[in-house]
Structure formats: structure tokens, C-alpha cells
């Protein structure tokens, strides 16, 4: 059996009951993948392309990835933060860390796939989505994908357009944005426009699966 490795941050991470109703898209991805593949979700909260590697979180994948496996790589949300332990620069260190993951996959005859970050649900007071929420990281990832001849799926642009289509208020149901006393873990409510609830996680997967289905290298992983 082959493996699909997922590496990234909290938007992909497998959550526990303690953080319910927060759900990473990686938690529900198996619903769309056929039984010939197992999913190993290594994504961790708060990690960047830099800290994920330097904390040793990539070791399990690096030691086990093999011919026929896939490596889905999604970083960017935390790379922009100023903390020196996690920050990367889009066109230098960010690309260097992404290249490391890509090269590990390639040397083991696995397929690396670059995914840009899902767009933050940031609307202005007029209900207009804020532009350039993720700075130059998606552009830098796309540039690297072209250079390395790697599959690139622009989840940032796709999810931005989805948010525009849904609008400010309706899109709240996809995110950890809700009123008080709705969930036991968050009695005071939550106004989090980055992390997903189950509807959001499924929506992200549906959009990702649509892109995968159109790619002959990737669509072999999907359920018929």
C-alpha cells in the first residue's frame, strides 16, 4: 500500500475533541481517497516550512517515503510571522525549505505536490475581501513549482474566490467564527477567520479534489 503524506500547519492538522469543532482539511481528506492509499497527516499547529523541518517533524516522512507515495506540502500561514524560529522570506528561505521537501520526495521516487495556503476570511467593513492576505508566499511557491517542475495547486486563489462568492456572513459557517454558548469548548464563542469547522474542511477538500481529478498524475488516488 502506498502513502499520501500531508505536511503543513493547523489548517491541515488532525484535531482532537479538546479543540472541537476545529477540523483541519487533512482530517477529512480520506473521505475522497481510495483504499489503495493510506494518509499520514503530519501537519502541526503553528509550524512554518522552517520550523516543521528544524523541529524534526519531517523525520517520519523522510525515513519512510517510497516509490509511488505522494507528499502534499502546504506552508505559508506561519512563515510570514516575525518570530525568528518560524519566519522565512518568500523568495529565499521559504523556497529553500520547500525545495528540501521536494527533493526528499523526488529522490525516493515519490510525487511532491505544492499547495498554497487557504485564504484567510478577512472582509473589510463593506464586505469586500481583503487583498494580498498571504503576501508573496503563494507567488514564491508557484515560481518554485515551475522551476522544479512540480505540481502546484493554488488553493489560495481558489479559496479566495470561494469566499468572494459566498460573501462575508455566509462564509462564517466554514470557519471557527461563532457566537457564545454554541460549543462546549468555546463558551465565549470564537472569532477565528483562519481555522476551519467541518463544513469548511469538507469544502476545502472538495475544491482540492476537483483539481486533483483533472491531473492524470494525481487522480489515481481518488475514489471512483
Task: Label each residue range with its predicted role.
Residues 9, 42-47, 86-87, 126:
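Short, basic, glycine/proline-bearing loop/turn elements
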Residues 48-56:
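Structural motif
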Residues 1-44, 59-71:
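Serine-esterase "nucleophile elbow" of acetyl-processing enzymes
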Residues 11, 51, 193-195:
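Residue-level preference for alpha-helix termini and adjacent loops
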Residues 14, 49-50, 81:
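Glycine/Thr-rich phosphate-binding loops of Rossmann-like dinucleotide-binding domains
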Residues 56-202, 206-224:
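Alpha-helical cap/lid subdomain in secreted, periplasmic
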Residues 2-7, 44-47, 130-142:
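Short, charged N-terminal helix-start/capping segments
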